[in-house]
UniProtKB/Swiss-Prot annotation:
InterPro entries recorded: PRibForGlyAmidine_synth_PurL (IPR010074), PurL_linker (IPR041609), PurM-like_C_dom (IPR010918), PurM-like_C_sf (IPR036676), PurM-like_N (IPR016188), PurM-like_N_sf (IPR036921)
Organism: Rhodococcus erythropolis (strain PR4 / NBRC 100887)
UniProt xrefs under Pfam families: AIRS, AIRS_C, FGAR-AT_linker
Its biological purpose: Part of the phosphoribosylformylglycinamidine synthase complex involved in the purines biosynthetic pathway. Catalyzes the ATP-dependent conversion of formylglycinamide ribonucleotide (FGAR) and glutamine to yield formylglycinamidine ribonucleotide (FGAM) and glutamate. The FGAM synthase complex is composed of three subunits. PurQ produces an ammonia molecule by converting glutamine to glutamate. PurL transfers the ammonia molecule to FGAR to form FGAM in an ATP-dependent manner.
Keywords: ATP-binding, Cytoplasm, Ligase, Magnesium, Metal-binding, Nucleotide-binding, Purine biosynthesis
Protein name (database record): Phosphoribosylformylglycinamidine synthase subunit PurL
Gene3D superfamilies: PurM-like C-terminal domain, PurM-like, N-terminal domain
GO biological process, one term: 'de novo' IMP biosynthetic process
SUPFAM superfamilies on file: PurM C-terminal domain-like, PurM N-terminal domain-like
One CC-aspect GO term: cytoplasm
Length: 762
């Protein structure tokens, strides 16, 4: 076969022994053999491209499927009651009442964001937004979970600058508010940053759309941007293998394929075009084109339908000349959608696309057969059973083994680490902690994002959870939070995942919303490492068991493996997103103190001497070891119930969860947010260091008007929730005072808290 000859099905049958680069495409010997067994011949070049991308770790979940099934086993019918779409769809969809539905999901774009930080992050946002669009919803907000190497490491500035500009540039151009997230710096993410993007959308329940191709004769319409060479191999090579640590400081870039290139303005009109198409009832089924491009869209639509599909591949609008069928099928060019449309609606469909200046092309049709066939200028280059491509890839039950080093890690507690003893040392610890890259203000980052575009943002960064209004008439809204702790998960993956769930659940609750559903993005090292698979297995079980205890379902998510450079893996990082519902956003609870004169500060929950895995141990001693804080999910539920009742009855004027940095961090953030000072009272007999810096879970700082203090504390006592009167808001005060120990002016706190990131990256 010459270099210019197309490898057709006829040719593949006639030349069964032709050498094929299946290993270069990420397939193993036995996987290639299985493809030949399925087809009864060797695959064509185009078929090989399809199977390689769809059987990649990123698309097939071949190493995680056996563990992800645990989510289904632990989800009850009661938990599923309000779930309209779940695991397996483009994004989860939840019925939130009054005829409204919300769809949300978290996705990773980790490896591309190291190779090309701006485009990697930008297209990560664009991809997750299209997942939301594909469910029939209008996207309304985005969030992000970012993990970078040490803040002062040489390459971190390049990655941070590109990623932050990419997230902001794409999201801002779409007109979507970025309402929160997390940014973490840790040396384990050097060379392997995590860029996890969340998007949420809203629709009426009856507007739900799903990805399936049914009805023989229905047309397949590709619409959006033209197809180019960008992103080819993204899921089979870039997202499904580790970065090579050879080659000096290249990070293995020489072997990596092109990163996708995004155009947010094309996506912006694509959103409006899709919404018009939905409103007109012109769409039977729809799928966005993201990872694996047309290979994914065609095989998944056909596999979910009731027949087959035929595609005329040469009709695909291309922006590069000389593209091969394999390249067209593998391209991950952005801003593209694929719809199933009845023949009588094609003209109307095209008119809507023309109105929005969106390129649309009829590229094929649904057939009454059982195969997906694809032709190239009249010659068949693909003839496959679509389920074997989309859903019946290899499944590996990889070895799972608790690392031998785990015992030593757990035994290495913080018990022997020096603690501050004097008042001066306590003050110095506070200032060092809030100025550290681990805890300092993310204002330098978040100010690059538009948080209030569209006018429906109620709470955003620096609140614990973001809140968006979805119904102007009733005030109904949603709250979202994403959280993760790689440090705790490294110590105990089961507990670490539950701590992330507990914090995200609590962050939604402190806004006054009721937590309803969960999405996740599970970021781990190589699945070929039994120790990594043990971490993954334990984290999945911890998260699933935690959701079952709280009674909220996992609606979907993402797994990102191979997050390591050479043999060095990232900290295991299960990102958990929680969606909550608030019936009236006017009763949301803000973070800042001082809404009413002389508020009483009350600490909800118990404080213990828990410092293993804490930010204090990291900042002061560069230490990681021991046992993470205990998690009590029943207490988290009680705490959420108390906060909901307090919001409805107007009993609290501010609330802030306690997590990294403990009470000291929460007080500083709440005081600076409200631009008012306060006095903190160390309980009699309590250790000031433990009181200020413990990271015990299940705690919230609330500000209560003096007139409501008796009523509020009485409710807590009656419900069995521990509470401690911990301080008072001093109206007009210019300092935060820990009574009897030290006092720091607000100006000094703000300088320490807000000066770090601009100095590093500004």
């Amino acid at each position: 076969m010459s270099a210019h000859q197309v490898d057709t099905v006829t040719h593949a049958s006639a030349d069964p022994d032709a050498a094929q680069p299946f290993k270069e495409l990420g397939l193993k010997d036995d996987e290639y053999a299985r493809i030949k067994e399925i087809l009864g011949r060797r695959p064509t070049d185009a078929e090989l491209a399809m199977y390689s991308v769809m059987w990649s770790e990123h698309c097939s979940y071949k190493s995680s499927k056996v563990h992800l099934g645990y989510f289904g086993k632990t989800t009850t019918d009661e938990m599923r009651a309000n779930m309209l779409a779940g695991i397996g769809e483009n994004a989860g969809v939840v019925d939130i009442g009054d005829g409204w539905a919300v769809t949300f999901k978290v996705e990773s774009h980790n490896h591309p964001s190291y190779v090309e930080p701006y485009q990697g992050a930008a297209t990560g946002v664009g991809g997750i937004v299209r997942d939301i669009m594909a469910m029939g919803a209008r996207p309304i907000a985005v969030m992000d979970q970012l993990r970078f190497g040490a803040a002062d490491a040489p390459d971190t500035r390049r990655v941070v600058d590109g990623v932050v500009r990419g997230v902001g540039g794409y999201g801002n151009s779409l007109g979507l508010p970025n309402i929160g997230g997390e940014t973490v710096f840790d040396e384990s993410y050097a060379g392997n940053p995590l860029v996890n993007a969340l998007a949420a959308g809203v629709m009426r329940v009856e507007d739900l759309h799903l990805a399936f191709a049914s009805g023989a004769g229905n047309k397949i319409i590709l619409f959006g941007a033209r197809t180019g060479l960008d992103g080819i191999g993204g899921v089979s090579v870039l997202a499904s293998a580790t970065f090579d640590d050879e080659g000096g400081d290249t990070g293995g870039r020489k072997k990596l394929p092109a990163v996708q290139v995004g155009d947010p303005f094309t996506e912006k009109v694509l959103i409006e075009c899709c919404l018009d198409l939905y409103k007109a009832g012109l769409v039977v089924g729809i799928q966005d084109l993201g990872g694996a491009g047309l290979s994914c869209a065609t095989s998944e639509l056909a596999a979910a339908g009731d027949g087959g599909m035929h595609i005329n591949l040469e009709k695909v609008p291309m922006r590069a000349t000389g593209m091969t069928p394999a390249e067209v099928l593998s391209s991950e060019s952005q801003e593209r959608m694929c719809a199933v449309v009845t023949p009588e609606n094609v003209d109307a469909f095209m008119e809507v696309c023309k109105k929005w200046d969106v390129l649309a092309t009829d590229i094929g049709e649904v057939t009454d057969g059982e195969h997906l066939t694809i032709s190239w200028h009249g010659e068949t280059v693909v003839d496959v059973p679509p389920r074997t491509v989309a859903h019946e890839g290899p499944v590996y039950n990889r070895p799972v083994e608790r690392p031998a080093s785990q015992d030593a890690l757990i035994a290495n507690t913080t018990a022997g680490l020096k603690r501050p003893e004097t008042d001066a040392e306590l003050e110095a610890t506070l200032l060092k902690m809030i100025a550290s890259p681990a805890l300092c203000s993310r204002k330098w980052i978040t100010e690059q994002y538009d948080r209030y575009v569209r006018g429906n943002t109620v709470l955003a960064e620096n609140a614990d959870g973001g809140v968006i209004r979805i119904d102007e008439k009733t005030g109904r809204g949603i709250a979202l939070s994403t959280d993760a702790s790689g440090r705790y998960t490294a110590l105990d993956p089961y507990t670490g995942a539950q701590l992330a769930l507990a914090e995200a659940f609590r962050n939604v609750a402190v806004t006054g919303a009721t937590p309803k559903a969960v999405s996740n993005c599970l970021n781990f090292g190589s699945p070929e490492d039994p120790g990594v698979m043990w971490q993954f297995q334990q984290a999945v079980r911890g998260l699933a068991d935690g959701c079952a205890t709280l009674g909220i379902p996992v609606t979907g998510g993402n797994v990102s493996f191979y997050n390591q450079t050479g043999s060095t893996a990232i900290l295991p990082t299960p990102v958990v997103a929680v969606l909550g519902v608030i019936d009236d956003v006017h009763r949301r609870i803000p973070t800042g103190l001082g809404l009413e004169p002389g508020e009483t500060l009350i600490l909800l929950g118990d404080t213990h001497d828990e410092f293993d895995g804490s930010i204090w141990s990291q900042v002061e001693h560069g230490h990681l070891g021991g046992v993470p804080p205990k998690v009590d999910l029943a207490r988290e539920q009680l705490l959420a119930d108390i906060l909901l009742a307090s919001s409805r009855d107007g009993l609290v004027t501010a609330a802030h969860d306690l997590s990294e940095g403990g009470l000291a961090q929460a007080v500083v953030e709440a005081a600076l947010a409200g631009e008012t000072g306060c006095r903190i009272l160390i309980p009699e007999g309590a250790d000031p260091f433990v009181t200020l810096f413990s990271e015990s879970s299940g705690r919230v700082l609330v500000a209560v008007p003096r007139t409501e203090e008796t009523r509020f504390t009485g409710m807590c006592t009656a419900r069995g929730l521990p509470w401690t009167r911990i301080g008072v808001v001093d109206e007009g005060s210019d300092s935060v005072e820990v009574q009897g120990h030290f006092s720091v002016t607000m100006a000094k706190l703000r300088e320490a808290f807000e000066g770090t990131l601009p100095a590093l990256f500004g």
